[in-house]
């Protein structure tokens, strides 16, 4: 089971970092870090670290923040570009995939979220850190890739995992 954080929750928004408006990258990484490590790492933890390292401002996160946060919290990060097969394989192995979305279902501008699972029809479940409602549906992986935004640092899709085999509770199903 994936831990879900929403960037709009009041608990994160007295920090002064503008998480509600621009904290989707660090919030997405808080989902991955907390899920994979079993440690309670909140959006405030990831945003403050990214800010201190120069990866985050009130305008949002730099793309290189994703691999940097993974490394800081002891995780691995593989940039997948927009490679359909690599994204699918990562999800099949229980590895969450952080995605940077462009205009479409999820945003009008740019928005980070997490792909958490894929079914036999190649529909993905998402942890959209900006919308609990959008997190309740499945989306065609093809559509998600087609709505991604051009990104640097190996993006717009990044596989996040532990050294060795990623193990989430999905592996025991």
Language-model segments: residues:
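Active-site-adjacent structural segments surrounding the nucleophilic cysteine of cysteine proteases
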Residues: 1-55, 138, 165, 170-173
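Ordered hydrophobic segments in well-structured contexts
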Residues: 3, 96-98, 112-114, 156-162
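Extracytoplasmic/secreted envelope proteins and their assembly/folding machinery
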Residues: 21, 25-33, 43-47, 63-70, ...
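Mid-length scaffold segments of soluble, non-membrane domains
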Residues: 48-82
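Residues that form generic nucleotide/phosphate-binding pockets
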Residues: 49, 53, 69, 90, ...
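Extracytoplasmic/secreted cell-surface and envelope-processing proteins
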Residues: 58-66, 106-111, 134-136
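Active-site-adjacent substructure of cysteine-protease-like catalytic cores
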Residues: 76-133
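Noncatalytic regulatory segments and standalone regulatory/sensor domains
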Residues: 118-173
